[in-house]
Every structure is written in C-alpha cells, then in structure tokens.
C-alpha cells in the first residue's frame, strides 16, 4: 500500500471518528445512534478503492480525480439535505438510504426555528395590546352603569320582594286597620314602587270609600313599609231611624253602618231631626264649636216657631236649656260655658235675639 492509499484510509477513519463524536454529543437514543453509524458505514464502505498496478504518477492522477468527484458528490448531497429541511420535509419523507450525517443537527435547527417562531408570536401578541383611550372609557361608563341599573331593576321586579309590604294605620278611632286598608284598595299583588308613586291616589280611595274619614295620607318608609295617616270626622250625635241608630258626622253625613242601642257611647247626643239638609247644616255648625260643649248636649230638637223657623232647643246634661238659631250656633253657643258657671238652678238661656237667661 502506498502513502496516498494510507492517507485515504486515515481520512475515512477521521470521518467516522467525527461522526462518532457528533453522535456522542447529541442526546439521541442508542437505536438512532446505531442507525446513523450504519448509514455512514454504508457510505464509507460502499466506495471501493481500486487497487492500481499503474505507475505512481498515474495512480496519483487517478486518485485525485476520484477524490474530487467524491467530494463534489458529498457536497451535492449536503446541499440537497439542507434544501429539504428548509422546505419543511420531515425525516419520513427522506429515504433512509439518502440520509447523511447532517441529519443529526436537524433537531437543533428545528428547536432554534421553534424558539424564533414563539418569539415572533409573542411580539405579535404584544403589538396587539393597544391601550384604550381614556375618553372611550369615560364614554362607556354611563352605558355600563345604566345597563347594571336596568338589570338590577329587572331582578327586583321578578323577585317576591317587589310585592312584599307592611301596612300600618295611624289615627283611626272607630275604623279598624283592616277596614282602612280595604278602603285604600291596596292589593297584595301591587308592586311597592307602584304604591309609592301613586300614594295620593290610594289615599283618595280611602276618603271616597269611607264617609268617616276626613283626611288620609300615605307615607313610604324604606324598604317596604307604608304608613296610612287618617283623621276621622267627629261624631256630633246620633239619629234614630226604624229602631236603628246612625251616627251623624261633623261633615253632615250620616254613617252608613247602623249601631245597636247597646253599642251607643255613654254620653251621646240624640238628634231629633228628620230633614237631611237641616241635619247636615247642624252637623257642620256643631263641628265648629268646642268638643267639651258639644259633649254636654243631651238632645237637640226643632220645636215649631212662628218667629224663627230654624230655632233649635238644646237640652243640656246639667239641666239647662239653650234656645239658639241653627245659623248662629257657632257664634253664640261658645258663650254657654261662662253663663252656665254663673247659674245655680236649671236655667233657660235664650240666644234667639241677643243672649239672656231666666229660670226654667
């Protein structure tokens, strides 16, 4: 063997050793390592080095030609492998026989490409994070607040809480709280918001449905309490109709519900009048005087009189008698307390023309 032949063998050994070093440096499985070594061995052993019997100069020329062609062939294969990797071909698409030792570095190249693609993707995501202008945010706040309020109202009206209520009645003397509530026409199915917004209308229902109520107001306390304040007309006396007693209110109206004699109060005033217009006028006039004087009247009669058609006779509980025209009750009867304190025997106090008294 010549010196050039030994150099060829040494170059082949160096290639194999380089391949072995690359395999050891890569973290691949033993099976893959054996496969790559077999391929390179096949490439290295498939090329037979011809034995030459020609002179040394001819052998050197032939060897140089063979070496140049072999290096060109290897360079061509390397370029083909690199192009296949760039075009995204997988290892399965490349025949096992055409793989070279450069396949060992494709994993590193792919990892590098993956890192580059992730970096580019991250940069794209960062570029998409655009700051929203403050003007847009301030314009969106009213819309969001309105939407939230509407949603809250919708949930409130759907829930049973919107109809759950507590009703209290204040100022009632003869009427019960249940009666006042029924007169208001407030229904359990009515929304609390509806009652609060139309409180005046419900209060008018009480006055309309009950002649005993003088004033009525409804006040709302959060969250669901309604207080009904009423003032009842004073009862100035009672009239008897067909063995039934009816209260006469200070408004001039006659109560609609009859009362038995056993249910009458101890100090009640009996009104012996039949004309409804006179009864109404009498009730209005008596409603203007002091309640103490009004409670001191036992009976009210209308005796016939040629001089004064509306002259009334008041029989007082202390035994005195008062004569007074119906149209002047609120003006003259207020003096009765002072006059009654001055007499010691039953006395008739005549207020028809002026005011004077004489013993009964």
From Swiss-Prot:
It holds the Pfam family FtsQ_DivIB_C. Residues 161-360 are extracellular. Residues 1-139 are cytoplasmic. Keywords: Cell cycle, Cell division, Cell membrane, Membrane, Transmembrane, Transmembrane helix. It is found in: Cell membrane. The chain crosses the membrane at residues 140-160. Residues 31-44 have a biased composition (Basic and acidic residues). It is a single-pass type II membrane protein. Residues 17-28 have a biased composition (Polar residues). The keyword Transit peptide does not apply. Residues 1-54 are annotated as: Disordered. Signal peptide: none annotated. GO terms for cellular component: cell division site; plasma membrane. Gene3D superfamilies: 3.40.50.10960. PANTHER family: CELL DIVISION PROTEIN DIVIB, CELL DIVISION PROTEIN FTSQ. Cell division protein that may be involved in stabilizing or promoting the assembly of the division complex. This is Cell division protein DivIB. It comes from Streptococcus suis (strain GZ1). The lineage of its organism: Bacteria, Bacillati, Bacillota, Bacilli, Lactobacillales.
């Amino acid at each position: 063997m010549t010196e050039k032949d030994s150099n060829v063998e040494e170059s082949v050994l160096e290639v194999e050793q380089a391949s072995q070093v690359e395999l050891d440096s890569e973290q691949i499985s033993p099976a893959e390592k054996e496969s790559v070594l077999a391929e390179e061995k096949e490439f290295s052993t498939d090329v037979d080095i011809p034995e030459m019997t020609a002179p040394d100069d001819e052998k050197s020329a032939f060897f140089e030609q063979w070496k140049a062609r072999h290096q060109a062939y290897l360079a061509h294969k390397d370029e083909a492998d690199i192009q296949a990797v760039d075009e995204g071909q997988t290892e399965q698409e490349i025949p096992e026989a055409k793989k070279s030792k450069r396949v060992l570095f494709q994993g590193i190249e792919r990892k590098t490409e993956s890192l580059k693609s992730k970096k580019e993707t991250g940069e794209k995501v960062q570029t998409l994070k655009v700051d929203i202008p403050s003007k847009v945010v301030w314009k969106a706040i009213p819309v969001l607040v309105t939407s939230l309020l509407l949603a809250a109202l919708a949930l409130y009206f759907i829930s049973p809480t919107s109809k759950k209520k507590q009703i209290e009645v204040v100022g009632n003397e003869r009427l019960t709280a249940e009666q006042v509530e029924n007169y208001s026409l407030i229904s359990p199915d009515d929304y609390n918001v509806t009652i609060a917004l139309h409180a005046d209308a419900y209060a008018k229902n009480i006055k309309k449905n009950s002649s005993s109520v003088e004033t009525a107001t409804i006040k709302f306390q959060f969250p669901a309490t309604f207080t009904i304040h009423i003032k009842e007309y004073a009862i100035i006396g009672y009239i008897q109709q067909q063995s039934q007693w009816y209260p006469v209110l200070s408004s001039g109206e006659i109560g609609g519900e009859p009362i038995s004699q056993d249910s009458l109060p101890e100090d009640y005033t009996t009104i012996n009048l039949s004309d409804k217009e006179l009864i109404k006028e009498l009730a209005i006039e008596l409603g203007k005087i002091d309640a103490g004087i009004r409670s001191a009247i036992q009976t009210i009669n209308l005796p016939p009189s040629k001089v004064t058609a509306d002259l009334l006779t008041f029989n007082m509980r202390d035994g005195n008698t008062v004569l007074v025209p119906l149209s002047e009750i609120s003006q003259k009867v207020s003096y009765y307390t002072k006059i009654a304190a001055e007499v010691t025997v039953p006395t008739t106090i005549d207020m028809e023309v002026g005011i004077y008294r004489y013993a009964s």
